[in-house]
C-alpha cells in the first residue's frame, strides 16, 4: 500500500500524448478566439458609434453647426458616415497633418480639460478639440486636436516630443490621417456623397454600380480635391451674449466691415447666440486674405473672452452634379423658387392688358429708406449666385441658362409702385404664351415633358429639401409644394400640376389661360365673381408674401412683449393723463363729429400725396375683393396713419415721447381703437361694409331664448303638481295565539306524554300552576317591582284594547 503512489494529473500520459500539451493547446486556442471576438466587437463598436460619437460634443452650437455643414478636409458626409481616421497607426506610414490624435485619455476627462491644458502651453493654439464619446456619453479614450496650419501642428508635436501628461497619465500623440476620399462614390440620381461601403444610395436607394458607370471616372476625385473658397467666413465659439458691435470692433483692425456684412445666428426662442456667426466680404479673395490673417494671429482672436475659430463657410448641401459630370450650385434651387413665382406673375400681368407696370420705389417716397438697404443686400447676394450659376451651367452643358436677371432681382424684399403704360400690341401680348410653350419641351433634363404620360406620383418617395422648403421627387427631378399641390421645375422655372385624367404634368399658366379664353364673353361677369379652384403662380407668390409679412409681425410683437410691466404702466398713466387733459381742452364736446369729418379729408390728402395706393399683394391681380386682400389693404393704409419721425398718431392727433409709447397707444388705447373702427368703416364700400357687419353678427352670440320671449311673451308658470297619496295595504300575518293556546301545541303533547292531564297542576304532586303564563306589558321607565309597572295586556290585544287597559290601570292607581 505504501509503495502504490497515485499518479498526479501533471504526470499522466497516454497513447494520445501528454495531457499537458493538450490543455495548453486548448487554452491557447480559446484565448485566441476570445481575442478575435473582442477585436471584432471593438471594431463593430467603432463603426457603429462613428457617426453619433463624432458629433457628441459639450457644445450644442458646434454640434448643430457640424451637422448642417459638409467638412471637406476631415471627410464628413451628409449620409451619416465619414471617412474614419486611422485608429490603428503604423509609425512608419504616419504622415504629417493638421489634426493630432491623443490616445489613452482618462475616461473622466472632458473637452474643456483638454482645451485648458492646451492653452496652458506656449506656442500655437488649436482651432478645435473633439473628444470621441459613445452613445451613453462615456469617453472612448481618444480625442482629435486640430490646428489652423500644418506648421503649427508639427511644431507643437516636436516641442512636446509626441508625449503629454494629463491627470498623471502619459498620453501618446499621433498624426491623424483620414482615409482616402476617392473611395467614396457620388449618386448620379440625387447627387448625394455616399460612404464607400454602401452598395446603395442612402437617400434614393440607387445602386452603386450604376452611378460608377454613369459618372465619368476621376470626376469625384477632382472635385473633392479642390478646396472650398467663397466670400463668406464663419466665426465659431462665440459667447451667448455677444453682439454685432463686439465682432465689428474685434475685426476692425483687419478689415472694414459694416453691420450688414455680419450675420449673428440666434436662437428663435431664447434670442441668445447659437455660437457662430457669418462674415460676408466683397469677394472670395478678400475673404481668403482675412482668413489667413485671423488664422496666423498669436495669440488667436478672442471676442468677449472666448477664443474664436475661423474657417470658410460651407454650403449646407452638396452641389448638384449633372449627368455629364459638371456641378451646379444647389442653392439656385431654393433661390429661384420664389423668384419664378413673382417673375411669372409680372409676365402674366403684362400679357393680359399691359396697362399696369410695377417698378421699384423712387427716392423720396414713403418706405424707400426702410427697404433701400435690404434691397441692395439682396440684389448683390442673388446676383452673385446667378453669376455663378450661369458660368457653371454654361460650361457644363453648353446651353443657355433660363434664369434671368429679372427673376433674380425680384427676390429682394421690395415695394412696388403702380404706374400706367400704353397698351401693348397683340403680338406683344402673345409673346409670353409662346415663350412658355417653347420652354415646355426644354424640361427634358429633369425627365418631365408636359403632354407625355407618366406613372402616378408616389409622395412617399419624396425627400424634404430644407433649403427650399419643398419636397424633391428623385424620379422626375421636380420640387413638390404640399400646400398648393404644385410641382416646380428648377430648370425651366415653371409650375406644373398633375392631371389624373391625362396622366401627365400640365403647366399652371396654361390652365389659367384656358379658363380665361375658353369661355364666351357673355359669361365673363359670372366668372369674375366665382373664385378659381386651383392656385396659379401669382397666387402662390401672394401666399409667400403674406407668410413673410406674418413672420415679421410676429417678430416685432415678440420683441415688444419683453418690456418691464411696472415702467409700462407708469408711463401709460402719465401719457394718458396728459393726453386726456389736452384732448379735453381742445376737443370739448364736438370731438367725435369733427373727427368723422376730418378722417375722409386726411385719407384724401394722403392718397394725393402718396401715389402708392395699393401694396404688393393687391397688385398681383384685379380680383382683390376677398377677405384676406381686404385686410392686407387696410393694414397697409393704417400704417400711414402714424408719423414715426415725429412720433405722432395722425388719427388721434397725439404726439408721444418715444416709439414704445406710440406702439402701446396703437395697441391698448380705447380712443385709438374707436377712431380706427370709424376710419375702417369710412374706407369700406357698401358691399364690404355689409360683409363686415354680417361677419360681426356671426361672431357675436345670438340669444335665441331672449328673441322668443320678446316675440311670444313669457308663458305662465305651470301649476304645482299634487303629491299622490298611497294607502298602505293590510298585511295578513299569522296569529296562532289570538284565540288562546289549545291542546295541539308541542308543549301540551310533551306534558301529556309525561303523565300530565289537562286541568291539573304541574309538578310531582300537581301543586303548580294550572293556567298558562300570560304576557304582560310594562311601562317605559318603570323598574321591576314598582307599583303600576305592568298592566294586563296580551299579545293578541288590539290597539284599542291596549289603550283601554292602560286607562283603566291609570284610573285604579289614582284611586
Swiss-Prot record:
Identify the PROSITE patterns for this entry: G_PATCH (PS50174), RRM (PS50102), ZF_RANBP2_1 (PS01358), ZF_RANBP2_2 (PS50199), ZINC_FINGER_C2H2_2 (PS50157)
Q: Where is this region: Required for interaction with U2AF2?
A: 321-809
Q: What ranges of residues constitute the RanBP2-type zinc fingers? A: 181-210
Low complexity biased stretches: 426-446
What are the RRM domain coordinates in residue numbering?
A: 98-178, 231-315
Q: Which family does it belong to?
A: Belongs to the RBM5/RBM10 family.
Record InterPro entries: G_patch_dom, Nucleotide-bd_a/b_plait_sf, OCRE, RBD_domain_sf, RBM5_RRM1, RBM5_RRM2, RRM_dom, Znf_C2H2_type
Q: Which residues form the G-patch domain?
A: 743-789
Q: CDD domains from the entry?
A: RRM1_RBM5 (cd12752), RRM2_RBM5 (cd12755)
From what superkingdom does this record's organism come?
Eukaryota
**Function, in words:** Component of the spliceosome A complex. Binds to ssRNA containing the consensus sequence 5'-AGGUAA-3'. Regulates alternative splicing of a number of mRNAs. May modulate splice site pairing after recruitment of the U1 and U2 snRNPs to the 5' and 3' splice sites of the intron. May both positively and negatively regulate apoptosis by regulating the alternative splicing of several genes involved in this process, including FAS and CASP2/caspase-2. In the case of FAS, promotes production of a soluble form of FAS that inhibits apoptosis.
Q: Which GO terms describe its cellular component?
A: nucleus; spliceosomal complex
- Kindly indicate whether the keyword Zinc belongs to this entry: yes
Q: What is this protein called?
A: RNA-binding protein 5
Quaternary organization = Component of the spliceosome A complex (also known as the prespliceosome). Appears to dissociate from the spliceosome upon formation of the spliceosome B complex (also known as the precatalytic spliceosome), in which the heterotrimeric U4/U6.U5 snRNPs are bound. Interacts with U2AF2; this interaction is direct. Also interacts with ACIN1, PRPF8, SFRS3, SNRPB, SNRPN, SNRNP70 and SNRNP200; these interactions may be indirect.
> What is any one GO biological process for this UniProt entry?
regulation of alternative mRNA splicing, via spliceosome
Q: What is its main location?
A: nucleus
The record's section on Pfam families has:
G-patch, OCRE, RRM_1, Zn_ribbon_RanBP
- Phylogenetic placement of the source organism: Eukaryota, Metazoa, Chordata, Craniata, Vertebrata
Organism, scientific name: Bos taurus (Bovine)
Q: Phosphoserine: which positions carry it? A: 18, 59, 69, 72, 78, 444, 621, 624
Q: Which GO terms describe its molecular function?
A: mRNA binding; RNA binding; zinc ion binding
Amino acid at each position: 500500500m505504501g509503495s502504490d503512489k497515485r499518479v498526479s494529473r501533471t504526470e499522466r500520459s497516454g497513447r494520445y500524448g501528454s495531457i499537458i500539451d493538450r490543455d495548453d493547446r486548448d487554452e491557447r486556442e480559446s484565448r485566441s478566439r476570445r481575442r478575435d471576438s473582442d477585436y471584432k466587437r471593438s471594431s463593430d463598436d467603432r463603426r457603429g458609434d462613428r457617426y453619433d460619437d463624432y458629433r457628441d460634443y459639450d457644445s450644442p452650437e458646434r454640434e448643430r453647426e457640424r451637422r448642417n455643414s459638409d467638412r471637406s478636409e476631415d471627410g464628413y458626409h451628409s449620409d451619416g458616415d465619414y471617412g474614419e481616421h486611422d485608429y490603428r497607426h503604423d509609425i512608419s506610414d504616419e504622415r504629417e497633418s493638421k489634426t493630432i490624435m491623443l490616445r489613452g485619455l482618462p475616461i473622466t476627462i472632458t473637452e474643456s480639460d483638454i482645451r485648458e491644458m492646451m492653452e496652458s502651453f506656449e506656442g500655437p493654439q488649436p482651432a478645435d478639440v473633439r473628444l470621441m464619446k459613445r452613445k451613453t456619453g462615456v469617453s472612448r479614450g481618444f480625442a482629435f486636436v486640430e490646428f489652423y496650419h500644418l506648421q503649427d501642428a508639427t511644431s507643437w508635436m516636436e516641442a512636446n516630443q509626441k508625449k503629454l501628461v494629463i491627470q498623471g497619465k502619459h498620453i501618446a500623440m499621433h498624426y491623424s490621417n483620414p482615409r482616402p476620399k476617392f473611395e467614396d462614390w457620388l449618386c448620379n440620381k440625387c447627387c448625394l456623397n455616399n460612404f464607400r461601403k454602401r452598395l446603395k444610395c442612402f437617400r434614393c436607394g440607387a445602386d452603386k454600380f450604376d452611378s460608377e458607370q454613369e459618372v465619368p471616372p476621376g470626376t469625384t476625385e477632382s472635385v473633392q480635391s479642390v478646396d472650398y473658397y467663397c466670400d463668406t467666413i464663419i466665426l465659431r465659439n462665440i459667447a451667448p451674449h455677444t453682439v454685432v458691435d463686439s465682432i465689428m470692433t474685434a475685426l476692425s483692425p483687419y478689415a472694414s466691415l459694416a453691420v450688414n456684412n455680419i450675420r449673428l445666428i440666434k436662437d428663435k426662442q431664447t434670442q441668445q447666440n447659437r455660437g457662430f456667426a457669418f462674415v460676408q466680404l466683397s469677394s472670395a479673395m478678400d475673404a481668403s486674405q482675412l482668413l489667413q490673417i485671423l488664422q496666423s494671429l498669436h495669440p488667436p482672436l478672442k471676442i468677449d473672452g472666448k477664443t474664436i475659430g475661423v474657417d470658410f463657410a460651407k454650403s449646407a448641401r452638396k452641389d448638384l452634379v449633372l449627368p455629364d459630370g459638371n456641378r451646379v450650385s444647389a442653392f439656385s434651387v431654393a433661390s429661384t423658387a420664389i423668384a419664378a413665382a413673382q417673375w411669372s406673375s409680372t409676365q402674366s400681368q403684362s400679357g393680359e392688358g399691359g396697362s399696369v407696370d410695377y417698378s421699384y420705389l423712387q427716392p423720396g417716397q414713403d418706405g424707400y429708406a426702410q427697404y433701400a438697404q435690404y434691397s441692395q443686400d439682396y440684389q448683390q447676394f442673388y446676383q452673385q449666385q446667378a453669376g455663378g450659376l450661369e458660368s457653371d451651367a454654361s460650361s457644363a452643358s453648353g446651353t443657355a441658362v433660363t434664369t434671368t436677371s429679372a427673376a433674380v432681382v425680384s427676390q429682394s424684399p421690395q415695394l412696388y409702385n403702380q404706374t400706367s403704360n400704353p397698351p401693348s400690341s397683340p403680338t406683344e401680348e402673345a409673346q409670353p404664351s409662346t415663350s412658355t410653350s417653347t420652354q415646355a419641351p426644354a424640361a427634358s433634363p429633369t425627365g418631365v415633358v408636359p403632354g407625355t404620360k407618366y406613372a402616378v406620383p408616389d409622395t412617399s418617395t419624396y425627400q424634404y429639401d430644407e433649403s427650399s422648403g419643398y419636397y424633391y421627387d428623385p424620379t422626375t427631378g421636380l420640387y413638390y409644394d404640399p400646400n398648393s399641390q404644385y410641382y416646380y421645375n428648377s430648370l425651366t422655372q415653371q409650375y406644373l400640376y398633375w392631371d389624373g385624367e391625362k396622366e401627365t404634368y400640365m403647366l399652371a399658366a396654361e390652365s389659367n389661360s384656358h379658363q380665361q379664353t375658353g369661355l364666351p364673353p357673355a359669361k365673363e361677369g359670372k366668372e369674375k365673381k366665382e373664385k378659381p379652384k386651383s392656385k396659379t403662380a401669382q397666387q402662390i407668390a401672394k401666399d409667400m408674401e403674406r407668410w413673410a409679412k406674418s413672420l415679421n409681425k410676429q417678430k416685432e410683437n415678440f420683441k415688444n412683449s419683453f418690456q418691464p410691466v411696472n415702467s409700462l404702466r407708469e408711463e401709460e398713466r402719465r401719457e394718458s393723463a396728459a393726453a386726456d387733459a389736452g384732448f379735453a381742452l381742445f376737443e370739448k364736446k364736438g370731438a367725435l363729429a369733427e373727427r368723422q369729418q376730418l378722417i375722409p379729408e386726411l385719407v384724401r390728402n394722403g392718397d394725393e400725396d402718396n401715389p402708392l395706393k395699393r401694396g404688393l399683394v393687391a397688385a398681383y391681380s384685379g380680383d382683390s375683393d376677398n377677405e384676406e386682400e381686404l385686410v392686407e389693404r387696410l393694414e397697409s393704409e393704417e400704417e400711414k396713419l402714424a408719423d414715426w419721425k415725429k412720433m405722432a398718431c395722425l388719427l388721434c392727433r397725439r404726439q408721444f415721447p418715444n416709439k414704445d409709447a406710440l406702439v402701446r397707444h396703437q395697441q391698448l388705447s380705447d380712443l385709438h381703437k374707436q377712431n380706427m373702427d370709424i376710419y375702417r368703416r369710412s374706407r369700406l364700400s357698401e358691399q364690404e361694409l355689409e360683409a363686415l357687419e354680417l361677419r360681426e353678427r356671426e361672431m357675436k352670440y345670438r340669444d335665441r331664448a331672449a328673441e322668443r320671449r320678446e316675440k311670444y311673451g313669457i308663458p305662465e308658470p305651470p301649476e304645482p303638481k299634487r303629491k299622490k297619496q298611497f294607502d298602505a295595504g293590510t298585511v295578513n300575518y299569522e296569529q296562532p295565539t289570538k284565540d288562546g293556546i289549545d291542546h295541539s301545541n308541542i308543549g301540551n303533547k310533551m306534558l301529556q306524554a309525561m303523565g300530565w292531564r289537562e286541568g291539573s297542576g304541574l309538578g310531582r304532586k300537581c301543586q303548580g300552576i294550572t293556567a298558562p303564563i300570560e304576557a304582560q306589558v310594562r311601562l317605559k321607565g318603570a323598574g321591576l317591582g314598582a307599583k303600576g309597572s305592568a298592566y294586563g295586556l296580551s299579545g293578541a290585544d288590539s290597539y284599542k284594547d291596549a289603550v283601554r287597559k292602560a286607562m283603566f290601570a291609570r284610573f285604579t292607581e289614582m284611586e
